[in-house]
């Protein structure tokens, strides 16, 4: 399916009318989680903010390890949005994608989003004492 068809089908399955704006964007709220969709050519970017990065230097190593080959990120990528100074999760879909594959990857994305938002909501780890 083409990007516009994927988005429309997602909306139909959620029971809402959903389409990309003239700017090629839309946002869907899954519970408490905002997920942004942005089209650029034949690529659909799926993005969500995880948490502010300020004061979370303790999280960088863990997030990098989780990001390695998508092992703990549902196949998505964890990064730092420098403009917002926040950790973000993002994935892409390219070209024609069967809807069931898109939905399965989106489900993994949302599960990863919720896991990392919860993990990042925990208090920052205390630095280890160096002797």
Each language-model region and where it sits:
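Short, highly charged C-terminal tails/helix-capping segments
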Residues: 120-131
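A short acidic/glycine-rich loop-to-helix N-cap element
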Residues: 95-104
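Short, well-structured hydrophobic secondary-structure segments
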Residues: 36-49
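Helix-rich interaction surfaces within compact, conserved domain-sized segments
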Residues: 105, 110-113
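Short, charged/polar, Gly/Pro-enriched secondary-structure boundary elements
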Residues: 35-36, 97
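Short, internal acidic amphipathic alpha-helical interface segments
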Residues: 47-83
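Charge-rich, low-complexity N-terminal segments
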Residues: 1-34, 71-75, 79-81
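Short, aliphatic-rich beta-strand segments
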Residues: 87-91
């Amino acid at each position: 399916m083409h990007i516009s068809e994927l988005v429309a089908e997602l909306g139909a399955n959620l029971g809402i009318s959903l389409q990309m704006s003239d700017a090629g964007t839309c946002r869907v709220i899954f519970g408490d989680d905002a997920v942004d969709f942005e089209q650029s050519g034949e690529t659909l970017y799926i993005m969500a903010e995880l948490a502010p990065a300020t004061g979370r230097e303790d999280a960088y190593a863990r997030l990098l390890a989780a990001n390695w080959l998508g092992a703990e990120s549902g196949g998505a990528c964890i990064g730092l949005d420098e403009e917002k100074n926040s950790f973000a999760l993002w994935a892409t879909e390219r070209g024609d994608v069967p809807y069931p594959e898109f939905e399965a990857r989106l489900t993994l994305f949302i599960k990863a989003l919720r896991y990392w938002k919860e993990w990042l909501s925990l208090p920052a780890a205390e630095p280890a004492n160096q002797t």
